[in-house]
């Protein structure tokens, strides 16, 4: 259900950690509702038989982790996963309560962050260590520079180093559907699909699989797949793994294949009715899923707290809603997984803010899920020393590590060192001696609401009532990526756009004005929102009377598009007679092809 889309933007940094700290008590959803009583009945309906082929053991607790977030100042832009396209949410906008306008039902205590920010990753790893999580399963897409895959890979590499410092384990959920997306986006040819996946597994073998912190099952490196969705034949995977030794321990989703070594489950939102997944239906699914795994020697079970996505509010389609129910949904799904005696319990997810399946602390949910995981760890390991109160320390360490006081940064480093040593007593003593205050309340980092406003920008061209000759006219382009067609650049909607195929230069855009006219001005616009950051596009302008012979009117020229300076629009003087007008793009500092949200032409 993961959505992989792209907006290419380059933005200027803003202050995201200045501003205030507000004390917020986490919401108690339905405080008058007896969720525990309701779920006691649901637990009685769980019918998970003792597995014939799996012994009782301590499963690894691994959090499914999304390394796909981008934010200033670490990155030049807010990535797609914080704004979901920007038509409804703009992280540059600060709401009245100090939160950034992000595409999520939930708000991280740190505010929107970058997955390559060491301060954020240290904070997250410390929380995992203190809650009893053994490591993470990275959502990972290979090593190609396509869409945001390169950024995801770079963030994963940074987080792996931090996890290893904390003695935490890691594995990968490889999404083979990303190869399909690369083919559809013309990043690779269809014939190169197998070799692209093979490249990813070769990289993992060379850099991760032999690592002592990489999770192994049956002596082989654990690899999950959210599918398979593209490579569905066993022979394809055998070719992909031909040079990988030992062969990965391959785990598909929900019995998708007959050749995987094991399977894992996920919130079954396809079973929703009327937009809602009812608990009895969830219980029936859990009984069915784990029943099918009874005779299998290995299992990855999954625990999830809820499913509350933002997709409908962002302009898309929701997958449905699974109620948090005061934390009882998480307890139910964890209990079901534990009864099945899995090798791994996958916590879904640490931080998928789009789908709303988060256990990372948020303003809305506080630390509830991590407290439960801590309880489960103490049940398995009574000597586990970290407490509920200790979970409140990392946000204060993050605050110090992200600040400018070198003494506080040093104190934070010392406390982090004690956390990854697992020394709860030293953590508490150092925190007290550093004068760090913390309590059971939620203390998010919020902005000053004064940061919000985007100044008015004067239009680069005033048509003075003249008709846009290009509006709705036929367009021919040399290439496009996905459904970003040429027609979207003449539809009068700045939220839609044309973009050429990746690295297929030059990118040509030709519009037929239907009849010849004396042309005076062409206007090229991008979305004016700040998530479409400053960039330079090199454009040549050509004209024609017959669509056969084109004359270069303006040679290749770099034009600056800047939402803060010109509203992401440029005006090009023409002064010519023509029916057809062609733009040839040869460079774009903000994307891998030409981009136009609206192309307007005016004349006499």
Task: Please give the residue ranges for each predicted region.
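Glycan-processing catalytic domains of CAZymes
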Residues: 30-462
């Amino acid at each position: 259900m993961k959505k992989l889309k792209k907006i290419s933007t380059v933005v200027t940094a803003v202050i995201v950690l200045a501003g205030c700290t507000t004390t917020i008590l986490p919401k108690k959803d339905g405080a008058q509702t007896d969720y525990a009583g309701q779920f006691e009945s649901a637990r009685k309906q769980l019918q998970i038989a003792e597995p014939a082929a799996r012994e009782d053991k301590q499963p690894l607790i691994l959090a499914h982790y999304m390394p796909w977030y981008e934010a200033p100042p670490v990155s030049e832009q807010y990535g797609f996963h914080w704004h979901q396209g920007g038509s409804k949410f703009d992280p540059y906008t600060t709401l009245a309560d100090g939160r950034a306008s992000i595409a999520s039902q939930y708000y991280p205590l740190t505010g929107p962050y970058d997955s390559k920010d060491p301060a954020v990753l240290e904070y997250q790893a410390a929380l995992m260590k203190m809650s009893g999580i053994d490591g993470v399963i990275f959502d990972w897409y290979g090593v190609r520079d396509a869409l945001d895959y390169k950024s995801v890979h770079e963030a994963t590499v940074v987080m792996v180093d931090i996890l290893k410092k904390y003695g935490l384990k890691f594995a990968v959920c490889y999404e083979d559907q990303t190869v399909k997306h690369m083919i559809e986006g013309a990043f690779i040819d269809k014939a190169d699909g197998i070799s692209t996946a093979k490249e990813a597994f070769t990289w993992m073998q060379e850099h991760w699989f032999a690592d002592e912190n990489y999770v192994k099952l049956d002596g082989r490196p654990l690899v999950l797949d959210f599918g398979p969705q593209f490579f569905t034949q066993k022979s394809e995977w055998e070719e992909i793994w031909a040079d990988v030794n030992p062969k990965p321990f391959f785990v598909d989703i929900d019995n998708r294949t007959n050749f995987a070594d094991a399977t894992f489950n996920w919130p079954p939102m396809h079973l929703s009715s009327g937009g809602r997944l009812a608990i009895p239906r969830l219980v029936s699914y859990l009984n069915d899923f784990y029943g099918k795994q009874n005779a299998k020697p290995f299992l990855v079970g999954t625990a999830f707290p809820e499913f509350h996505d933002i997709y409908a509010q962002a302009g898309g389609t929701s997958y449905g809603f699974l109620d948090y129910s005061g934390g009882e949904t998480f307890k139910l799904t964890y209990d079901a997984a534990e009864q099945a005696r899995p090798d791994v319990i996958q916590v879904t997810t640490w931080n998928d803010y789009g789908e709303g399946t988060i256990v990372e602390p948020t303003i809305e949910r506080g630390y509830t899920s991590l407290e439960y995981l801590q309880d489960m760890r103490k049940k398995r390991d009574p000597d586990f020393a970290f407490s509920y109160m200790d979970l409140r320390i990392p946000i204060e360490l993050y605050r110090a590590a992200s600040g400018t006081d070198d003494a506080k940064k040093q104190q934070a480093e010392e406390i982090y060192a004690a956390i990854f040593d697992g020394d709860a007593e030293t953590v508490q003593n150092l925190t007290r001696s550093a004068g760090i205050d913390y309590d059971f309340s939620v203390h998010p980092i919020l902005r000053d609401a004064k940061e919000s406003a985007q100044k008015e920008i004067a239009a680069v061209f005033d048509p003075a009532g003249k008709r846009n000759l290009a509006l709705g006219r036929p367009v021919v382009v040399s290439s496009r990526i996905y459904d970003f067609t040429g027609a979207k650049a003449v539809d009068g909607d700045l939220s839609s756009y044309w973009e050429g195929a990746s690295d297929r230069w030059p990118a040509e855009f030709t519009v037929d004005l239907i009849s010849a006219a004396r042309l005076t001005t062409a206007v090229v616009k991008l979305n004016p929102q700040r998530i479409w950051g400053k960039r330079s596009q090199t454009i040549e302008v050509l004209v024609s009377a017959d669509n056969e012979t084109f004359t270069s009117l303006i040679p290749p020229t770099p034009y600056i598009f800047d939402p803060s300076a010109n509203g992401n629009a440029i005006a090009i003087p023409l002064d010519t007679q023509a029916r057809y007008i062609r733009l040839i793009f040869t460079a774009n500092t903000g994307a891998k092809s030409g981009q136009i949200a609206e192309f307007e032409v005016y004349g006499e």
